Design a protein with these regions (language model features):
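N-terminal loops that bind phosphate or other acidic moieties
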Residues: 1-19, 23-216
């Protein structure tokens, strides 16, 4: 949220927000708070955008959301298709990676369910969108409150770098991945680069720190 504000202050008209590598699972509440959304308990008092605070959440006040966002194109770069809630959602899939126990995962999913319910019918509907659960639910907040849209992260990078044009006349492409496994094939950079190269019949070599059996 603070980075988005800084970009707005700098006059940015197009924002690309990378989703991944987050240590949070708050449904984007922290970002939204920085952008002017208020999170309130049953008495109308502000609550913290932490699991403890969100446990008391009763309403959202979006009246203070930075109005400049209405004139800015927002894209979310994402390489996962997880929804916000449920067994494939932000809490269940990524919570354990961030240290959450099974009991905490259930609590986090309950909190995100409440958050989406309080956001209105649009927020409830967007909770099932692919990528809504990315970065602890930040994807959902971008879709719901910032009017953003999801884009494949690797597609955005390919466009920005002009990779497809650079492939013309290439004899080979070298790319890399920390761990080449089944997840690599679900939208990771190496898979996207390989797909772009395959369109032009250019062979690809992937360097990886580890190659799992399910990558073959």
């Amino acid at each position: 949220g603070e980075l988005v504000l800084a970009a707005l202050d700098a006059g940015a008209r197009r924002l690309v927000i990378g989703l991944g590598g987050s240590a949070t699972n708050d449904g984007g509440a922290g970002m939204l708070a920085a952008l002017g959304v208020r999170f309130l308990d049953a008495r109308g008092r502000p609550v913290a955008t932490t699991p403890t605070g969100l446990a008391h959440l009763a309403s959202l006040d979006v009246g203070g959301l930075d109005p400049r966002l209405a004139d800015v194109e927002v894209q979310a770069a994402c390489d996962v298709d997880s929804p916000l809630l449920g067994p494939r959602g932000a809490s269940a899939v990524f919570g354990p990676q961030k240290g959450a126990t099974a009991q905490q995962v259930m609590l986090l999913d309950t909190l995100l369910t409440r958050l989406s319910a309080l956001s209105g019918t649009r927020g409830v509907a967007l909770a099932s969108e692919p990528g809504a659960g990315a970065a602890g639910g930040l994807g959902w907040a971008i879709l719901t409150f910032l009017g953003g849209r999801m884009r494949s992260g690797v597609d955005l990078v390919i466009e920005a770098t002009g990779l497809r044009e650079a492939l013309t006349g290439a004899t080979a492409v070298l790319t890399g991945e920390g761990a080449a496994d089944a997840q690599t094939l679900t939208g990771k950079t190496a898979a996207g680069v390989a797909a772009a190269a395959r369109e032009r019949g250019v062979p690809v070599v992937v360097f990886a720190g580890r190659i799992a059996d399910d990558a073959r």
